[in-house]
Amino acid sequence: MESQQLSQHPHISHGSACASVTSKEVHTNQDPLDVSASKTEECEKASTKANSQQTTTPASSAVPENPHHASPQPASVPPPQNGPYPQQCMMTQNQANPSGWSFYGHPSMIPYTPYQMSPMYFPPGPQSQFPQYPSSVGTPLSTPSPESGNTFTDSSSADSDMTSTKKYVRPPPMLTSPNDFPNWVKTYIKFLQNSNLGGIIPTVNGKPVRQITDDELTFLYNTFQIFAPSQFLPTWVKDILSVDYTDIMKILSKSIEKMQSDTQEANDIVTLANLQYNGSTPADAFETKVTNIIDRLNNNGIHINNKVACQLIMRGLSGEYKFLRYTRHRHLNMTVAELFLDIHAIYEEQQGSRNSKPNYRRNLSDEKNDSRSYTNTTKPKVIARNPQKTNNSKSKTARAHNVSTSNNSPSTDNDSISKSTTEPIQLNNKHDLHLGQELTESTVNHTNHSDDELPGHLLLDSGASRTLIRSAHHIHSASSNPDINVVDAQKRNIPINAIGDLQFHFQDNTKTSIKVLHTPNIAYDLLSLNELAAVDITACFTKNVLERSDGTVLAPIVKYGDFYWVSKKYLLPSNISVPTINNVHTSESTRKYPYPFIHRMLAHANAQTIRYSLKNNTITYFNESDVDWSSAIDYQCPDCLIGKSTKHRHIKGSRLKYQNSYEPFQYLHTDIFGPVHNLPNSAPSYFISFTDETTKFRWVYPLHDRREDSILDVFTTILAFIKNQFQASVLVIQMDRGSEYTNRTLHKFLEKNGITPCYTTTADSRAHGVAERLNRTLLDDCRTQLQCSGLPNHLWFSAIEFSTIVRNSLASPKSKKSARQHAGLAGLDISTLLPFGQPVIVNDHNPNSKIHPRGIPGYALHPSRNSYGYIIYLPSLKKTVDTTNYVILQGKESRLDQFNYDALTFDEDLNRLTASYHSFIASNEIQESNDLNIESDHDFQSDIELHPEQPRNVLSKAVSPTDSTPPSTHTEDSKRVSKTNIRAPREVDPNISESNILPSKKRSSTPQISNIESTGSGGMHKLNVPLLAPMSQSNTHESSHASKSKDFRHSDSYSENETNHTNVPISSTGGTNNKTVPQISDQETEKRIIHRSPSIDASPPENNSSHNIVPIKTPTTVSEQNTEESIIADLPLPDLPPESPTEFPDPFKELPPINSRQTNSSLGGIGDSNAYTTINSKKRSLEDNETEIKVSRDTWNTKNMRSLEPPRSKKRIHLIAAVKAVKSIKPIRTTLRYDEAITYNKDIKEKEKYIEAYHKEVNQLLKMKTWDTDEYYDRKEIDPKRVINSMFIFNKKRDGTHKARFVARGDIQHPDTYDSGMQSNTVHHYALMTSLSLALDNNYYITQLDISSAYLYADIKEELYIRPPPHLGMNDKLIRLKKSLYGLKQSGANWYETIKSYLIQQCGMEEVRGWSCVFKNSQVTICLFVDDMVLFSKNLNSNKRIIEKLKMQYDTKIINLGESDEEIQYDILGLEIKYQRGKYMKLGMENSLTEKIPKLNVPLNPKGRKLSAPGQPGLYIDQDELEIDEDEYKEKVHEMQKLIGLASYVGYKFRFDLLYYINTLAQHILFPSRQVLDMTYELIQFMWDTRDKQLIWHKNKPTKPDNKLVAISDASYGNQPYYKSQIGNIFLLNGKVIGGKSTKASLTCTSTTEAEIHAVSEAIPLLNNLSHLVQELNKKPIIKGLLTDSRSTISIIKSTNEEKFRNRFFGTKAMRLRDEVSGNNLYVYYIETKKNIADVMTKPLPIKTFKLLTNKWIH
């Protein structure tokens, strides 16, 4: 390819400014990927070899014969010497000419690449005749140059370089960052000097020594372009080039000027680093000198922090000032000003008395609180004061020196230890000092002896873990450079020179030795009491002696000052000389790691974090001083700019201009909060808030939904309010970009009223801070108020309203006024305010009886908007009323006592506070107030209607069964009511809502859900009122709902034999919610029953039998009875609690029905299948009932409930009809292309792994002879339809391996190139589950295999061609395929036929009829899934024999042989299986879900409350038309595809309990409304919360040697849109769930019986097929059973009368069902609905029911 490239540029000379020294010829078809680690290694070896040679060779000897290839150098010519740099490109010096120029001297050839020919490296106009430098030449800028000398020289030095001797010239490094340009220019100037171009370099006056020629200018331009890419140039350089792209001389001139300007900075740094002060000059002059230097450096951008400045100053102090050197050990945060205070104090004492020793102290408190310092010892400190704690208490000395040591820590660089510590640091320029980093301990000048040291003694240290001494004369058996790290109290390293033994010879002539470390960098010789204790020596500070544990005195302890010392006379001297120990390497490398390198090495952390980590030794191996921090401040990492992109920062106080530009109420902020779930429908789910920018006045309005008309009503209201009340006109309203604000309706309204909408920018919620903060504040207040008062959650908006009133009246700390005052309103009269939730007694002006009490307990909420009254909540009436007729309830029974607030709130104070308000009402009260109205006009919170599914416990302890008191009155006197029944009036059940309709007891952090069935976001509640509902044609109405009536005691069921009530399920028509209908008279009911259609006579009464299981036939033999019991015995059916009779008191009958529309559901198209009503007469037929919507509206009109909104008619539309302008949805791509994985992959490690996988795949393709390598075809000669595009795809597997696959583009394959009749088969999941189940029951061994590159073993019949892989470099050629390449349409079928033939002919297997990819013989069963095989056998040797045969033909890998008797873990087709033979098998996907779900970008809540069920029952999905643009629609559909795709994969693998929810949501993939997405998120959240759940199987222990195959069936009638029914089936083998199915019925059923028949008919075919599979795999007899909870279906199957079906449209299906049951020897039995586990397949269930039906088989 190189030759082709060069031939296209004949005008380019083959000479080059770079000479190649590689010794291998570059071939045109070489794989570019091979230029990797191995090639670099060869170059480095060549470079190393070059460095060892000392001779050079003329350039002419390197000229190759072939101008297109780099020839190897002659063996006699040694490669050039040029230091440690790679030798890919060198430059030679040929007298006075630039090296490598073809017409100046001999050219030096280099291999060319297309990158060199890029036009970007040539100036416009005529092309330069000089060759360009390749991008790979040069060395990284971070590589230190070995050349010494000045960065630039004058002409004389340049001329001196012009010698006749040729030498090789190293090119400059590549510029990699704009911050590195100053350093790069120096190396570039050096390069020009070495290239005999020193005369053209501008001097200090800006002019060159000689005039530059055109050829030299071209050379200058080309080399500058090569080694200084435009993207890395500083801005000022780009500005020069933008004017004249060839003006390199101006760039060099300005660079030299900048170097000169840095001289003053360098001088200041050198001066600061070499300060000396001993008091000979005034302290003021010294301070002025230092501060001036620091100020100049700071002004020039070189920041000198206090810590560095203090260290530099203290290092130069001497004489009486030297003790201040160690002040930094006491004061870590000392400033320069504080240090000079100490210097001034000593200087003044010096001047006052020259002969007195200074005893200056900064502060006495410092002496008490800080570690021991190195000051003089006027008042020395005590090291160990407590004799009892000498061994474990850390002394101050320890904190000042060595807090901890570690033998595993990397040793510090000891090169600097042997240097003189008193020698000042000499700096040549400012780059020698890296400012901002802390000086290490080794650079601090330590004196040999401190002033407070006792000479000839060792200081006893109770806190030091090691003994340290400064002299080496007492160290025995010393070894240099120990791998020990010792740090002082400030976590600084103390360099250690050697380690050895310290030997003692005590008074009792005993000798003892301990380990000792040698370092000259400490102030005292420290003797560790911890190490002495290790050799049985302790210090007794009461006797002042060292002694053994037996009391033997070894040596005296001397107290000098506050320290304790031991004489060195007890130490034995050694024969080791000091130079031996101190012989440490002194050649410290000056190379520093560049900050960009460290930045990338440490995961792109910021400089401050990296420096802090190095300073605190959290990162080891190198220190802070080893890094070049000069570019850290200005360095911009492009990866960080992209990966860490953030929103713009909002300027504090930026809204002041709005406050100055607008008058009050002209600029509003608004936002919507919601929805709040699990509330009654009368309670608002949202609220919208408004805030005035100038006055900060707030308004809040409740919302039940976010429809356009609802929002528009609120905007109309507030604009009229502001206009009329404040005589102002709103000019601007700021809001976010929610659809409720951006719709056309509101936009036209604002435009009509002349209001400017101000929207926030995309994803910039902070710009909407005013409204967002208000909502957050109000919600905080709401939660607090509800928690304090104990009121139920459905009163949440009342708490918001109360908070808004109060906060409008509170003064702002900033403006000193309240919002009401800014608005010109009077302050809030607190006497009119009651605490939120204050218990009160409200007068009932219209009781049901004159003898009933007139007082009703209630709870004060907030002042009324519409009157002078107060909004009060009456739990007994489930109302809020607006009234002034109330009395504050006094006594200890107030709701505050449950929070122990009695000490904070007092009734006396409350009465005194509200006295004036109540006296005003009393004095102006003329007649009894009649404002207590049950149908209150309060527009937002009256008639608190409970959720229709909420449970009602009318038999609470407060109500007796015989109590007939109406619900609105009380039977006890007011005193008892106020004292005992304030929280729970007898007529109301305290458990009536999720959070309790009355104030609860003190709420715990974990919500109690013992009697409340709800999901994490709500759940399903039971009915609280008697309801009527239409029924089906069948008088028996056998459905999946039939036995699921709920006891009002929260029992699962009740017996109808003990009551006069009949259970009637509320059907869900057309997918709408369940509408209740009013009670009707018995007479009317009987009238409607007369016109009822006749039912099937064969249907027996459903509730006459008390048996749970009813067979299709009456057992006539013991065998049949045993069969029934055997089928039921092993099934994982729930254990039900014992039933109890339920009685219904009279008050329950008198409660009126309440109807309202439903809120959004968690799963759509679902009616309340678990809600039941009671009537006193017979059932009614479905045909005679009006539609639910009509009845509900009539009920609403009849009851005249003005405060309730009637149910809205939902417009049902077809899902596809709602999709507008949908073209195609792109499939989800999880793989990477070649350019993503390799070419542009910035992750080097991952790139290398993909490259390795690439070569592995290519080698495998060649090994398998995938294509014909003997002949290449021209593309023009081949029919285009036979040419298949190919590509490499890359992906990372679950086990962490990186995979590359060369595939064909089968998606665009022409139909003529394959046989469409061929099929690619894989094992059915039911077959795999059946095989696994049989393996568990029969103690089989399970072996898992994998066949590498399986498709490539199959030959291809068709004539097909593909393009060669990229590494061959033949884009215009084609190769003919010989094997079935992955991706071809026919590859799967070809492989299936190949492996099938081999297994049958060579392995003696046969394929099970009807179950593809399941093979068996007498000993082994094989399940095949493409290239994965699972073998089952009783004898492991049988599996091994099959494996040996497979290995003879295929590359077979054993993934898991399965020979262990312990638990074995498999990963089979995505299932994570734990199997212990003969005991159990667990199937799950925890690891897979843990990895995949977080990648879906679903807002998970890992720390919050876990969901207990995947959805809520009883609600529906709104089907209003979507108003959404096409791009957003496609994005949401794509998101739904990902979420539902993963959920389906998991559900059909083993989470059969989720199939209903998955199937329902899958029907709405093309209808991605906000509600549907929320439901999907809820499902994914439940999967995340239960990702550890497993399908549990236990080995079957049968009573008979039979296999039992059972299908459990269920159906939900008409609960899907368009009256479609949901059907579900679960299949079990020997009591183990092996599969499940949930789907919407294809036909519209007209009754529950027909729906059940449809479900059973769907189950029987698969049941028969599974029966055949089980019999083929295991020769035992098989019993087939089918269970259903529909007695009507069983009766139809049982009946032999055909006449009754002739006029039935489901008669044909029923007759066929009879034939299938009788012809397949199928047993059909009745199962009670409460035990029907298939119920989870047809409808959403309450938590309790859901858990009850699933916890036996999945947990």
Curated annotation (Swiss-Prot):
Residue ranges occupied by any Integrase catalytic domain in the UniProt entry: 660-835
Basic and acidic residues biased stretches: 1038-1053
Chain positions covered by the region annotation Integrase-type zinc finger-like: 583-640
Protein residues bound to Mg(2+) 1: D671, D736
Source superkingdom: Eukaryota
Keyword Lyase in annotation: no
Active-site residue list: D461
InterPro entries: Aspartic_peptidase_AS (IPR001969), DNA/RNA_pol_sf (IPR043502), Integrase_cat-core (IPR001584), Retrotran_Ty1/copia-like (IPR039537), RNaseH-like_sf (IPR012337), RNaseH_sf (IPR036397), RVT_2 (IPR013103), TYA (IPR015820)
Reverse transcriptase Ty1/copia-type domain span: 1338-1476
Low complexity bias: start-end ranges: 153-165, 402-418, 960-969
GO cellular component labels: cytoplasm; nucleus
Positions contributing to Mg(2+) 3 binding: D1610, E1652, D1685
Domain RNase H Ty1/copia-type positions: 1610-1752
Subcellular location: Cytoplasm; Nucleus
Region (RNA-binding): 299-401
TM spans (from-to): none
Composition skew (Polar residues), residue ranges: 1-10, 48-60, 127-152, 1005-1015, 1054-1082, 1101-1111
Catalyzed reaction equations: DNA(n) + a 2'-deoxyribonucleoside 5'-triphosphate = DNA(n+1) + diphosphate; Endonucleolytic cleavage to 5'-phosphomonoester
MF terms in GO: aspartic-type endopeptidase activity; ATP binding; DNA binding; DNA-directed DNA polymerase activity; RNA binding; RNA-directed DNA polymerase activity; RNA-DNA hybrid ribonuclease activity; zinc ion binding
Site (Cleavage): H401, N402, N582, N583, A1217, A1218
Motif Bipartite nuclear localization signal location, chain numbering: 1178-1212
Known partners and oligomeric status: The capsid protein forms a homotrimer, from which the VLPs are assembled. The protease is a homodimer, whose active site consists of two apposed aspartic acid residues.
Note in the entry: Retrotransposons are mobile genetic entities that are able to replicate via an RNA intermediate and a reverse transcription step. In contrast to retroviruses, retrotransposons are non-infectious, lack an envelope and remain intracellular. Ty1 retrotransposons belong to the copia elements (pseudoviridae).
Protein name per its UniProtKB record: Transposon Ty1-LR4 Gag-Pol polyprotein
The organism of origin for this protein: Saccharomyces cerevisiae (strain ATCC 204508 / S288c)
